[in-house]
Amino acid sequence: MHIGVLALQGDYAEHANMLEANGAEVSEIRLPDQLDDVDGLIIPGGESTTIVQLIDIYGFRNKLVELASDGFPMWGTCAGMIVMANELTDHRPDPLKIMQIKVSRNAFGRQIDSFEENLKFKGIKEDFPAVFIRAPIVISTSDDVEILS
């Protein structure tokens, strides 16, 4: 499987390294036409306002929305999830509106309020050590969104 990692801003290198360590073929995606060569896309964490600005500057928005409507697999972590959301509680950034969720940015407060928590994930036997750093929280989902943890 060939996975693309949107490499405009944020922790794209960490995502790419982890995927490669687990046997995936990985490409860092910097231009919209590179999406034609991958089987799925990860939009990594980083700063959501900056990521959205770069998505628009580099002309990704229409391509990502089109791919999502065609069922192209995408995963967003932290800021990536914010970018994909249908609705935000904040007035910015303007998300892609490709995942039917409502998200509150920085819901866990300031940087000093960051914490770690072991989570149970559907399909994973062992608890997963999750780090919440000024993390967003999903306020609501549509009925067709599957909650994994």
Residue map of PLM features:
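Residues at the C-termini of beta-strands that transition into short coil/loop
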Residues: 7-9, 30-32, 100, 107, ...
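Amide-donor transfer/coupling interface in amidating biosynthetic enzymes
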Residues: 105-149
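Structural motif
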Residues: 40, 72-73, 97, 129-131, ...
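Cysteine-nucleophile active-site neighborhood
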Residues: 48-120
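Flexible, glycine-rich phosphate/dinucleotide-binding loops
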Residues: 12, 35, 83, 90, ...
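Structural signal for conserved beta-strand scaffold positions within catalytic alpha/beta enzyme cores
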Residues: 5, 28, 76, 97-100, ...
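N-terminal beta1-alpha1 cap of cysteine-dependent amidohydrolase-like domains
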Residues: 1-69, 73, 122
